[in-house]
Amino acid sequence: MSTGPSFWRGTESGAEIAVAGSVVVKRHRPGTPLIERLALAADHPAFVPPLRSTPLTDADGRPVTLWPRVPVLDPNDAEHPWVEAARLLARLHLSPAPAGLPRHGWAQRLARVRNRAPTELVPLADRLLAQLAARAEPARLVHGDWHLGQLGHWTDGWRLIDIDDVGLGDPAWDLARPAGFWAAGLLPDDDWDAFLDAYRAAGGPAVPRHGDPWPVLDLPARCAVLVAAVHSGGTADALVEACRRMAQ
């Protein structure tokens, strides 16, 4: 695990983060709904709690939140906490959804990616956006942008960080990235099996307890691969090739 150096950086979603000592300051995209999300993170044991349960506003009118600086997952670690992450997500997905939360952020993320995608991937993005819009979803509590980088180590173990896309919807979206990376050949079978088995054992509602999970995961996984293909560096070739196969 690593806490990393102190520096300002932008995120793929348009937010900005500064680390100052033991505090992480996050400037969110204008208009990001934060009041209900902060209240959830302050009370729910699946999240690293904020230092303030209400947002501030900077000189440009952008909402600002304050967080404790916690160790995050080091991608160079030999082992990743797939089992712990699966149990954490199942716990979140089984929790009652508080009133006032918006929908999760996948539709907005896919739309942003569509505007940045290379020409050959735009038709795929349009097709996935149409399928997403037509998808009937339950109103469960979801993180909305989950991957291993969204884990922070708190006093009692791993918890979730980054509330920008927390909302209501199908919990299958929180399994989208590992599912998509596994389908693209970028996540080993053992890791995917450990993650899926632990999620099912914890009662996670995103997939059937037994049988093929892919009818539920197919669209979220395809969306996750497209998003990663547009944003990625070292794995871009494999992800773009996976997108080409999806487009056929």
Regions of interest found by a model, annotated:
Residues 24-65, 71-91:
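A conserved alpha-helical element in kinase catalytic cores
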Residues 6-25, 130-173:
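Active-site acidic catalytic loop and adjacent metal/ATP-binding pocket
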Residues 30, 72, 158, 166-168, ...:
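Activation segment
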Residues 63-77, 94, 111-115, 222-237:
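A glycine-centered beta->alpha junction motif in the catalytic cores
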Residues 206-221:
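All-alpha amphipathic helical-bundle segments outside canonical DNA-binding/catalytic cores
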Residues 1-5, 34-37, 62, 238-248:
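Regulatory N- and C-terminal appendages and interdomain linkers associated
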Residues 172-205, 222-237:
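Active-site activation/catalytic loop segments of kinase-like enzymes and analogous catalytic loops
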Residues 73-123, 137-139, 168:
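A cross-family kinase active-site recognition segment
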